[in-house]
Amino acid sequence: ATARGTHQGVPSAHLTFLLCLDGTVEMLRMPDPARTPGTFDAFVGGLHVEPAVIASGAPQAGLQVDLTWRGARTLLGLPAAALQGDVVDLGSLLGRTAHELLDQLASTRTWRSRFALLEAALGRLAAAGEERGREPLPEVGYAWDRLEETGGTLRIEELAREVGWSRRHLAGRFRDEIGLAPKSAARVIRFERACTRLRAPQPPGLAELAADCGYVDQAHLARDFRELAGLTATAWRAERPDATGG
């Protein structure tokens, strides 16, 4: 039998749209620990600022899409804020469409055909979303884009000035759409950038990584890894198979 273990689902600047073809995903601790854990064969996971704990060890196969907050509104018809800190069964979001898609993917024999099937399904959802026509506030979109462009290092006071809103008004409108305050979003974007650098075949040292990604110092980087990943940076890298070429 395969040994049962766990791995951490760390914060990201994208929502997770996942469909299982073999096995299920068992959430032992939700991104928001106040929410009830569960087992899913298809789900969307919202943006979050704490690590989820996921059971590992059982064989699994599936398809995952990294979904932007804009994509959540287009495909699902709701703001990313509605999913913040949560993992929601796809059937409760898309109804029969979710179950039909899972069945079609399971009966399709090649990965190429599965990708094509999923792409077509997402295209239909996007077209329906465009007909609904509700667009996020352009100021919120601008603010997010600026945080991404700067790797999460832009000061929120400066961001508010660029947008032309008070910091408090920006925080409220941003949170209403995305689910995180701008400061938390910047933190997640910066953390994800550090994770990407750390997974490179020849990663930088932690002091260099901290400086390159806009952390105050190495201790600041270490604190973010403890709080966002539940692990040290070194332990987090060792847990990732592609970090060692596996």
Residue map of PLM features:
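Nucleotide/phosphate-binding loop and acidic/charged catalytic motifs
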Residues: 170
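DNA major-groove recognition helix of helix-turn-helix
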Residues: 174, 186, 224-226, 237
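Alpha-helical bundle regulatory/interaction domains
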Residues: 1-167, 177-182, 196-219, 232-246
